[in-house]
């Protein structure tokens, strides 16, 4: 009895295991008739469903068992036939606005596509998984993709768990939850891998965020799919303004209508033989959607686009929003153009618009555009300096640079260059490209390794001061961990310019990379343990110490130094400490702890007077982004500006972007007012210059004058007009993505931000009025456009969101040194500027019928003067008192 019972238990266990492991099966000789619909809608995430644009395809779908593997019962070949096709709008439009009204499926799809879509196809179904799809290879790609979408609705399994599987949208991690007669299939879309390629901006602050979800709910009856409902959403938004977002919603529904008598299965040993017997034109075409290239009928070519936008790209139009908008249109056209087309436009462009065209061609970042611009520019000639520098800056701001771009600059640097300034810019910009490629994980590419070796060895390979500075600035852009020892070495240099560049470069590194040895070097510089340093060098060293996780003793020694420094540096360091406390910078808790010691914190130390200052504040705070600024100004003891440093930062998505840094440095000007230089600065050559860092890219510094004779000649010929530091068009945000949907349709998303910018600065001296004035002027216009489209070769629908603005920011410092203490007034003004948001939606048929809707909202943001410390306000009243 016991052996028999044991045998029964074993048989029961085997049967149960077999049942759990079995997949869904269709019966022979039966036809399963379903209704099917797939719908795609596009809108803003906050838009009402009635405001969607898109289309719906509905049909009947008949499925029957064509063949079953005699050895593996769960391997089945299904024949699927689509019929009674209808195409209609997914939005709720009036009859007047419904472009699908009165149109038949044949008039929309075309006779060839309709016949191909209604042609039966085969699906190899094993354990509920689609292993292959068979169709005629000559069928249009759009038709095959729609068939893949229908087949994807059959994907299922009868036990819970996670696995990687492929359907129309790609190979993804899928989670199944099985409960009696219901199967819930959740696809983790962030894991999906497909044949589609795209690119995005490297900076999270300027980048795009996405949210996506996909779920299919399958209801079973007697082991057969009774219904399957799929919902898939993709939302893309601009990090700096999440309201500017687009959404695509895809729905699929498969519902069993009836089960009727159908054809019997075909006999055969293997799949290949059966498929050939059914239709010798059938080939395995894969499950994942294939790429399609919809043809744009009536779209303008590059020359036509250029003629339409060139008037908005003239220099006098760059401060208007039309300039970056036209720039984005031109970049879009350039990316579809050949090298010869691009060269033709370059060669037939006016001199005034050519610099802007160079910006656009370089920003296109295609092999054709790069090859065309390199052939057009002649770096051996000095007279092309403006165009050459615009090309180099556009490379530095490239959103997704390639190895070929870096290799091209390396070859330019090794060739004949007619201008010293261009030679410097080439090397400096190579550093910026190096960093961006390393951030993409491409640090081991051959060109990257060559440039890395060049930059690391560069400072020690030359005795020319300008070349050493060039390599140090390139390292400041590259931010290589291997560059820290090189920068630490030059930070202690006897040449002030080397020290300043090296120290400000170290400040850009992650504090975790600043080693104890580097900190010791910075402390030696600040406290002058080995030699005397210039004030601006010591101040820069103090900034790095305070921002690099300082120790208790480091902070204490900084505080104890106040009172033993040159007069204006005492005031600068005091302002710096107070700014750390007021703005709650990372070191503020440690500073508070040190200040509990009365030796470090007392009235004598904290009552130092002077005009130097350090101040941080908020420019803007929104739910999406926080924008801060800081202004540091250091004067010599005689009242002449030594260093002015303005920084603007943007923070979003836990990432920081150094949006702007403008530094004006001056030295050796005491002789103009018969004043005595500070300690360590007695032998400095007269010099004034300006350096800019824009969107994390250090640009080549600009010299106002160098040497006493140059100073005097410029003073007598000075017009008072500011000197341009950087001017041009920048592709700030650049995101391109193709989203394969489970329905077999493909959504394309493009987000781009164009910025026209003009940064200039100047210094004015009046010996008669004993007054100096420095100015930094920032003017620009910003346009951001994001669109999501589903474009087949028979219908297209899309939604576009955007916003634009024009702004001016001026920073002016006025110093009156007719008496001591001298009067200093700092002004940071933002003018009133317009702000516009737009939303447009569109549906279009090949016949030319189109529905479009556009809405916009305008507002004016009032201008303001950014608040600085109260001491500055009091000083400004005195400076401008006579005028009041």
Curated annotation (Swiss-Prot):
Induction: Expression is strongly up-regulated in the anterior intestine and to a lesser extent in liver in response to feeding in both larvae and adults (at protein level). Protein levels are not changed in 1 or 6 hours after feeding. Highest expression in the proximal part of the anterior intestine. Lower expression in the distal part of the anterior intestine, in the posterior portion of the intestinal tube and liver. Very low expression levels in heart, brain, ovary, testis and kidney. It comes from the Eukaryota. Gene3D superfamilies: Lipovitellin, beta-sheet shell regions, chain A, Vitellinogen, superhelical. PROSITE patterns: VITELLOGENIN (PS51211). Its main location: endoplasmic reticulum. The keyword Cell division does not apply. It is found in: Endoplasmic reticulum; Golgi apparatus. Disruption phenotype: Larvae do not absorb dietary neutral lipids, consume very little yolk, are small and die by 6 days post-fertilization (dpf) with pronounced edema. No defects in intestinal absorption of short chain fatty acids. Loss of visualization of neutral lipids in the vasculature, heart and head structures by oil red o staining. Levels of apolipoprotein B, vitellogenin and lipovitellin unchanged. No cardiovascular defects or global intestinal function impairment. Increased expression of Foza2 and Pgc1 proteins. Leads to excess angiogenesis and yolk absorption defects. Keywords: Disulfide bond, Endoplasmic reticulum, Glycoprotein, Golgi apparatus, Lipid transport, Lipid-binding, Signal, Transport. Residues 26-660 form the Vitellogenin domain. GO terms for molecular function: lipid binding; lipid transfer activity; lipid transporter activity; phosphatidylethanolamine transfer activity; phospholipid transporter activity. GO terms for cellular component: basolateral plasma membrane; endoplasmic reticulum; Golgi apparatus. Disulfide bonds join 172-192, 438-443. It catalyses: a 1,2-diacyl-sn-glycero-3-phosphocholine(in) = a 1,2-diacyl-sn-glycero-3-phosphocholine(out); a 1,2-diacyl-sn-glycero-3-phosphoethanolamine(in) = a 1,2-diacyl-sn-glycero-3-phosphoethanolamine(out); a cholesterol ester(in) = a cholesterol ester(out); a triacyl-sn-glycerol(in) = a triacyl-sn-glycerol(out). Heterodimer; heterodimerizes with the protein disulfide isomerase. Catalyzes the transport of triglyceride between phospholipid surfaces. Catalyzes the transport of cholesteryl ester, and phospholipid between phospholipid surfaces. Required for the assembly and secretion of plasma lipoproteins that contain apolipoprotein B. Required for yolk lipid utilization and absorption of dietary lipids in larvae. This is Microsomal triglyceride transfer protein large subunit. It comes from Danio rerio. The gene is mttp.
């Amino acid at each position: 009895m016991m052996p028999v019972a044991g045998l029964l238990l074993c048989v029961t266990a085997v049967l149960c295991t077999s049942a759990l492991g079995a997949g869904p099966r269709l019966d022979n000789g039966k036809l399963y008739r379903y209704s099917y619909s797939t719908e795609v809608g596009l809108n803003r995430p906050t838009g009402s469903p009635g405001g969607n644009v898109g289309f719906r395809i509905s049909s009947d779908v008949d499925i029957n068992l064509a063949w079953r593997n005699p050895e593996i019962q769960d391997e089945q070949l299904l024949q699927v036939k689509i019929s009674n096709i209808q195409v209609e709008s997914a939005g709720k439009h009036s009859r007047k606005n419904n472009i699908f009204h009165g149109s038949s499926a044949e008039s929309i799809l075309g006779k060839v596509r309709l016949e191909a879509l209604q042609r039966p196809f085969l699906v190899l179904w094993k354990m509920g998984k689609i292993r292959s799809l068979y169709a005629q290879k000559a069928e249009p790609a759009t038709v095959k993709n729609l068939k893949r979408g229908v087949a994807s609705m059959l994907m299922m399994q009868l036990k819970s768990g996670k696995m990687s599987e492929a359907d129309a949208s790609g190979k993804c991690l899928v989670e199944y939850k099985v409960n009696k007669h219901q199967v819930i299939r959740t696809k983790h879309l962030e894991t999906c891998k497909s044949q589609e390629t795209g690119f995005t901006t490297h900076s999270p602050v300027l980048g795009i965020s996405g949210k996506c979800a996909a779920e299919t709910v399958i209801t079973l009856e007697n082991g057969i799919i009774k219904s399957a409902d799929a919902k898939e959403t993709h939302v893309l938004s601009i990090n700096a303004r999440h309201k500017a977002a687009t959404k695509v919603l895809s729905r699929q529904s498969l519902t069993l209508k009836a089960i009727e008598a159908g054809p019997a299965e075909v006999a055969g040993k293997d799949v290949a033989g059966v498929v050939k017997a059914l239709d010798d034109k059938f080939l395995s075409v894969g499950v994942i959607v294939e790429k399609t290239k919809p043809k744009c009928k009536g779209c303008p070519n590059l020359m036509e686009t250029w003629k339409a936008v060139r008037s908005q790209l003239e220099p006098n139009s760059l401060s208007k929003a039309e300039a970056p908008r036209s720039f984005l249109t031109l970049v879009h056209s350039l990316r579809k153009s050949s090298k010869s087309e691009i060269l033709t436009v370059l060669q037939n462009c006016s001199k005034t618009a050519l610099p802007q065209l160079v910006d656009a061609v370089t920003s296109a970042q295609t092999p054709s555009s790069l090859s065309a611009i390199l052939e057009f520019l002649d770096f051996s000639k000095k007279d092309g300096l403006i165009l050459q520098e615009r090309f180099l800056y556009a490379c530095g701001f490239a959103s997704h640079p390639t190895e070929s771009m870096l290799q091209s600059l390396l070859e330019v640097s090794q060739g004949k260059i007619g201008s010293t300034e261009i030679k410097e810019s080439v090397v400096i910009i190579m550093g910026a490209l190096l960093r961006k490629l390393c951030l993409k994980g491409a640090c081991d590419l051959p060109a990257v390794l060559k440039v890395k070796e060049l930059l690391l060895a560069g400072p020690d390979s030359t005795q020319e001061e300008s070349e050493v500075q060039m390599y140090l600035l390139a390292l400041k852009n590259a931010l290589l961990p291997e560059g820290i020892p090189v920068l630490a070495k030059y930070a202690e240099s006897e040449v002030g310019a080397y020290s300043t560049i090296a120290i400000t470069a170290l400040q850009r590194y992650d504090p975790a990379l600043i080693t104890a040895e580097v900190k010791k070097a910075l402390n030696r510089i600040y406290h002058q343990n080995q030699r005397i340093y210039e004030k601006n060098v010591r101040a820069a060293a103090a900034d790095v110490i305070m921002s690099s996780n300082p120790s208790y003793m480091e902070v204490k020694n900084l505080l104890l130094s106040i009172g033993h420094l040159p007069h204006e540096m005492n005031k600068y360091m005091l302002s710096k400490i107070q700014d750390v406390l007021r703005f709650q910078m990372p070191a503020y808790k440690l500073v508070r702890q040190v200040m509990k010691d009365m030796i470090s914190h007392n009235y004598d130390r904290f009552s130092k007077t002077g005009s130097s200052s350090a101040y941080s504040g908020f420019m803007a705070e929104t739910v999406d982004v926080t924008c801060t600024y800081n202004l540091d100004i250091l004067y010599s003891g005689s009242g002449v500006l030594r260093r002015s440093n303005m920084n603007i930062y943007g923070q979003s998505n836990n990432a920081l972007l150094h949006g702007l840094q403008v530094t004006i440095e001056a030295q050796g000007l005491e002789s103009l007012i018969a004043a005595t230089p500070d300690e360590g600065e007695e032998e400095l050559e007269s010099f004034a210059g300006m350096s800019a860092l824009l969107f994390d890219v250090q640009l080549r510094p600009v010299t106002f004058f160098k040497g006493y004779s140059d100073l005097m000649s410029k003073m007598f010929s000075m017009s008072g007009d500011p000197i341009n530091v950087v001017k041009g068009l920048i592709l700030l945000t650049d995101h391109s993505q193709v989203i394969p949907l489970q329905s077999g349709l493909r959504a394309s998303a493009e987000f781009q931000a164009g910025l026209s910018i003009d940064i200039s600065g100047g210094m004015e001296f009046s010996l008669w009025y004993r007054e100096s004035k420095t100015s930094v002027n920032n003017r620009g216009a910003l346009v951001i456009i994001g669109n999501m489209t589903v474009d087949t070769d028979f219908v297209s629908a899309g939604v576009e969101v955007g916003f634009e603005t024009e702004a001016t920011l001026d920073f002016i410092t006025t110093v009156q040194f007719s008496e001591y203490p001298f009067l200093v007034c700092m002004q940071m003004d933002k003018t009133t500027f317009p702000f516009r948001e737009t939303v447009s939606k569109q549906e279009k048929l090949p016949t030319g019928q189109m529905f479009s809707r556009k809405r916009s909202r305008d507002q004016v943001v009032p201008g303001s003067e950014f608040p600085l410390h109260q001491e500055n306000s009091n000083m400004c009243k005195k400076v401008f008192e006579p005028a009041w």
